[in-house]
């Protein structure tokens, strides 16, 4: 890769199981990406989320412009939750994309929103672009299908690396992952129904 330096990832992760003894987490994926490249690699902030109110609180923290509280160098928002069409599920109630857009309220300029969840973006392109405009985000990324957590975690090593590296040009990440030179990447993209929507995306 020959682009700009990595931006950080601000990760919001819900509970994957009702039994809280189960320690399933996407955090090791983030730690791998951090550790593989050392000081030059990906940095992250990771928060476990149990309720919609907690998600709203930490989204507001992520987007804060208060002195000493800025996360402007964490330009990828990683939303790892159970999901379904147009929704993510922190555990204590569902959150719609409309809810999330209202919380963000246009403050996600220059950021990428990645939904690591089942079917959240199984929507018309124009509906997703409406969400994009409402949030002010540079790109919205996610799956149109139900996904298996292990497959998603494996692909997230590639996807998060690309999104954080090409954060100023998300379409370049899309091109990288879909390149005919990388058919093994393409297979993951198709299996997960991955889409990367930007303001210039066609229906």
Identify the role of each PLM range.
Residues 120-203:
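Active-site-proximal C-terminal subdomain of hydrolase catalytic domains
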Residues 35-37, 70-73, 101-104, 138-141, ...:
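Glycine-rich loops and low-complexity Gly/Arg-rich segments
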Residues 1-74, 88, 110, 115-116, ...:
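A domain-level signal for caspase-like cysteine endopeptidase catalytic cores
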Residues 79-80, 90-91, 113-121, 143:
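Short His-Asn-centered micro-motif
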Residues 16-17, 84, 120, 147:
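Conserved beta-strand elements of beta-rich interaction domains across eukaryotes
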Residues 81-112:
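A short, glycine/acidic-enriched catalytic loop
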Residues 64-68, 75, 96-105, 124-129:
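Short, charged beta->alpha transition segments
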């Amino acid at each position: 890769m020959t682009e700009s330096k990595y931006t950080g990832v601000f990760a919001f992760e819900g509970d994957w199981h009702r039994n809280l003894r189960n320690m399933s987490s996407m955090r090791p994926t983030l730690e791998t990406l951090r550790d593989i490249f050392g000081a030059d690699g990906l940095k992250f902030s990771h928060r476990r989320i149990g309720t919609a109110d907690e998600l709203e609180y930490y989204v507001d923290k992520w987007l804060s412009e208060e002195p000493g509280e800025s996360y402007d160098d964490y330009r990828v928002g990683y939303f790892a939750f159970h999901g379904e069409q147009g929704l993510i599920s922190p555990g204590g109630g569902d959150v719609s994309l409309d809810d999330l857009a209202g919380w963000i309220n246009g403050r996600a300029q220059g950021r990428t929103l990645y939904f690591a969840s089942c079917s959240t973006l199984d929507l018309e392109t124009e509906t997703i672009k409406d969400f994009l405009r409402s949030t002010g985000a540079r790109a919205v990324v996610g799956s149109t299908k139900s996904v298996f957590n292990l497959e998603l975690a494996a692909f997230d090593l590639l996807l998060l690396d690309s999104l954080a590296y090409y954060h100023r040009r998300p379409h370049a990440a899309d091109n990288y992952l879909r390149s005919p030179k990388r058919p093994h990447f393409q297979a993951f993209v198709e299996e997960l129904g991955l889409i990367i929507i930007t303001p210039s995306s066609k229906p």
